[in-house]
């Protein structure tokens, strides 16, 4: 009997090893393979200038840039337009060597900015400067602000995102800032950072960018690590990290805005949850907005992203988060929480992307609306008691329109998109049985919507 038990035990171990080996072989590239970086040489001129938020409240701004491996002294020069006074501030530099090359990451902080004022600035490395850029600070008001939200960008080299983003910029010149839900670059490589910057260069120097880490910004391995360039580009992370988690929050106008890092291995999410609860509990703002890369409720499979859901979703509901902005799954989807009467309430969960790649979609009954095979952008306007989220296709057609109204009588969600047809086109990447399955499920969803 003892021999039999041992054989059974060894058989189970062998089976686990075989199954594990098969899974590792199938998923090897996804989990462990990092594409070699193309060789590059950075010039000594300051380049890839990004304006971001800082770490000292809504009036704080940082600027980051890169240059070659010879320059050392980083400085920020700026002036309040019309004042005639120019300030020169010492910046910080970090020499970074990657598999493709090397150079300096630089960053600096603006000081004593004022509500409503406009500033011109340029950055220096030794005796080389960038062009002059300018930006305007928000007015001293808690009644109104707006921003643009973009899901994954993740474009190829010489891609189409630049035209897409230029169009968004011209449509919403008064947007206070831009939020990106990760996968800002296709890969953590210099050539893709160049591509990402060129896609947003006219925005990046004039509006604060607020970016969550995505899985494409990570280096794969047994323990995934955020590629070191990311935190020096979005330098607010250098001071906001919590127990090695790349998290950040800012109180802006009458909102607390939070970004999480959903790419971390599950054991890191415990400390993120701890930080998130402290941040939400401390917030006295009317609106609470959270951004993370992976959808809390996946639209690729009901069991996807379970650790993210278990760690964060209960806190979103307990502390009254209004809007959850997500990416990763390369389709459009909008979900609202439901109260005991089945009425829509917060949080409002939004999944979106602006990448040329569209993935398969698993229709989840928890969601209210889907969209496939298009690129999307969202404009969020907060005025008084109302937060309005409008989603658009790449051709500027209105695709979704939802209002969250918060007043003394409670929170109400108004769906203004009921008469806008859903677009459930076949993603170009699907074929064969997967394509047939998509069509069947899409038809079921359409019929479900008709019944509702």
Regions found by a protein language model. Name each.
Residues 149-151, 177-183, 208-215, 260-261, ...:
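Active-site neighborhood of phospho(di)ester-bond hydrolases with catalytic His/Asp-centered motifs
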Residues 100-101, 282-284, 288-298, 351-357, ...:
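Active-site-proximal loop/helix segment associated with metal-binding centers of metalloenzymes
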Residues 2-149, 373, 382-385, 390-452:
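Acidic, histidine-bearing metal-coordination/catalytic regions of metal-dependent phosphoesterases
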Residues 159-160, 189-192, 270, 300-304:
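Short, solvent-exposed loop/turn segments at secondary-structure boundaries
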Residues 128-181, 186:
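An acidic-aromatic substrate-binding cleft motif
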Residues 109, 118-136, 190-284, 311-312, ...:
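Extended active-site neighborhood of metal-dependent phosphoesterases/phosphodiesterases
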Residues 144-145, 176, 247, 254-255, ...:
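Alpha/beta-hydrolase fold active-site loops
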Residues 283-324, 344-345, 360:
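Active-site-proximal segments of metal-dependent phosphoesterases and phosphodiesterases across multiple
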């Amino acid at each position: 009997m003892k021999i039999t038990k041992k054989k059974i035990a060894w058989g189970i171990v062998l089976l686990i090893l075989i199954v594990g080996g098969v899974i590792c072989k199938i998923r090897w590239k996804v989990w462990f393979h990092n594409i070699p970086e193309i060789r590059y040489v950075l010039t000594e001129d300051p380049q890839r200038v990004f304006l971001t938020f800082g770490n000292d409240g809504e009036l704080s701004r940082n600027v980051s840039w890169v240059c070659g491996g010879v320059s050392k002294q980083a400085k920020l020069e700026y002036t309040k337009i019309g004042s005639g006074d120019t300030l020169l501030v010492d910046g910080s530099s970090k020499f970074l060597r990657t598999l493709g090359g090397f150079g300096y990451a630089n960053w600096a902080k603006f000081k004593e900015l004022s509500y409503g004022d406009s500033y011109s600035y340029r950055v220096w490395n030794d005796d080389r400067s960038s062009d002059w850029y300018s930006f305007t600070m928000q007015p001293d008001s808690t009644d109104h602000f707006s921003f643009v939200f973009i899901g994954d960008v993740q474009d190829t080299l010489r891609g189409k995102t630049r035209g897409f983003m230029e169009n968004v910029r011209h449509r919403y010149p008064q947007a206070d800032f831009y939020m990106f839900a990760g996968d800002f670059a296709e890969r953590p490589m210099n050539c893709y950072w160049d591509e990402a910057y060129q896609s947003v260069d006219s925005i990046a120097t004039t509006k604060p960018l607020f970016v969550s880490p995505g899985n494409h910004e990570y280096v794969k391995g047994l323990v995934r690590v955020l590629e070191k360039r990311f935190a020096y580009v979005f330098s607010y992370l250098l001071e906001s990290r919590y127990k090695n988690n790349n998290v950040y929050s800012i109180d802006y106008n009458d909102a607390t805005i939070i970004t999480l890092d959903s790419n971390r291995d599950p054991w890191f999410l415990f400390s993120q949850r701890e930080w998130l609860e402290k941040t939400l509990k401390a917030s006295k703002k009317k609106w609470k907005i959270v951004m993370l890369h992976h959808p809390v409720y996946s639209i690729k499979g009901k069991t996807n992203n379970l650790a993210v859901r278990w760690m964060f979703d209960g806190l979103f509901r307990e502390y009254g988060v209004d809007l959850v902005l997500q990416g990763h799954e390369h389709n459009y989807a909008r979900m609202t929480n439901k109260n005991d009467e089945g009425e829509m309430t917060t949080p409002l969960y939004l999944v979106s992307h602006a990448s040329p790649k569209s993935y398969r979609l698993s229709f989840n009954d928890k969601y209210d609306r889907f969209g496939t095979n298009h690129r999307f952008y969202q404009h969020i306007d907060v005025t008084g008691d109302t937060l309005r989220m409008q989603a658009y296709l790449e051709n500027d057609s209105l695709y979704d329109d939802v209002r969250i109204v918060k007043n003394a009588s409670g929170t109400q969600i108004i769906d203004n998109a009921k008469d806008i047809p859903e677009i459930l086109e076949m993603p170009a990447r699907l074929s064969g049985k997967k394509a047939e399955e998509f069509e069947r499920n899409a038809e079921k969803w359409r019929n479900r919507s008709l019944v509702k």
